């Protein structure tokens, strides 16, 4: 019962967030989408999927002013820019960045240790999976910079390959359901379930590869 109540609260919060973002994006257009996606990369508690869907919604509502394909391009730039910022903060400042209180809230020592263990265990594959893990994405990208295990070019290529799977789906889903938000919220929940299944499949594949 408690879990059902918590889930209901989360759904309501996401609906409110989407309504706010749709209004914000309608007012300020592509630049607003770019800005929000970049700060999402810093671990700000704004769901990236809701942000992308909201960008797609305004493309569906105002096709004469907003092009969905251009929205996809802007979104990809925003996603990669936000992720790159976390990488470079880690690469430039190293563990010193953890002295900065806002960063310390995102990248705790416990998360830092856990991410380092995952890197040792799975290598660069962790970067690909990180794109689908909202709570761990920022710490993983920052640690990849801190440890310097991967060059920036390789980092961007891996991040791009992961982003090009999810970003278009959310953008075009938002465009498709722009005039039926109730249906859209249902599809978002289904999409999130598919992502969790995909992550589980990747995790299982990694375990199988280790046995070989």
Curated annotation (Swiss-Prot):
Which chain regions cross the lipid bilayer? 20-40, 70-90, 155-175, 192-212
Tell me if Transmembrane helix is a UniProt keyword of this record.
yes
What membrane topology does the annotation report for this chain? Answer: Multi-pass membrane protein
Q: Does the keyword Methyltransferase apply?
A: no
Q: What InterPro entries does the database record attribute to this sequence?
A: DedA-like, VTT_dom
A GO CC term assigned to this protein in UniProt: plasma membrane
Its principal location? Answer: membrane
Q: Where in the cell is it found?
A: Cell membrane
The UniProt keyword set, sorted, is: Cell membrane, Membrane, Transmembrane, Transmembrane helix
Query: What PANTHER family does its record include?
Result: INNER MEMBRANE PROTEIN DEDA-RELATED, INNER MEMBRANE PROTEIN YABI
Similarity section = Belongs to the DedA family.
What is this protein called in UniProt? Uncharacterized membrane protein HI_1629
Print the organism lineage.
Bacteria, Pseudomonadati, Pseudomonadota, Gammaproteobacteria, Pasteurellales
């Amino acid at each position: 019962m408690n879990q059902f109540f918590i889930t209901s609260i989360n759904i309501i919060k996401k609906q409110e967030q989407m309504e706010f973002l749709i209004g914000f994006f309608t007012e300020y257009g592509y630049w607003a989408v770019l800005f929000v996606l970049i700060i999402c990369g810093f671990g700000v508690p704004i769901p990236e999927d809701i942000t992308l869907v909201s960008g797609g919604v305004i493309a569906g509502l105002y096709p004469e002013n907003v092009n969905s394909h251009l929205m996809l391009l802007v979104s990809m730039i925003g996603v990669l820019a936000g992720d790159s910022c976390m990488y470079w903060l880690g690469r430039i400042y190293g563990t010193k960045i953890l002295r900065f209180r806002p960063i310390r809230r995102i990248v705790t020592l416990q998360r830092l240790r856990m991410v380092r263990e995952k890197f040792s265990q799975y290598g660069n594959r962790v970067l690909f999976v990180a794109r689908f893990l909202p709570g761990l994405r920022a710490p993983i990208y920052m640690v990849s910079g801190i440890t310097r295990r991967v060059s920036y070019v390789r980092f961007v290529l891996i991040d791009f390959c992961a982003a090009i799977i999810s970003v278009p789906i959310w953008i075009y889903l938002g465009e498709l359901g722009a005039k039926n938000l109730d249906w859209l919220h249902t599809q978002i929940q289904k999409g999130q379930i598919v992502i969790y299944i995909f992550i589980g499949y990747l995790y299982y594949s990694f375990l199988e590869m280790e046995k070989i």
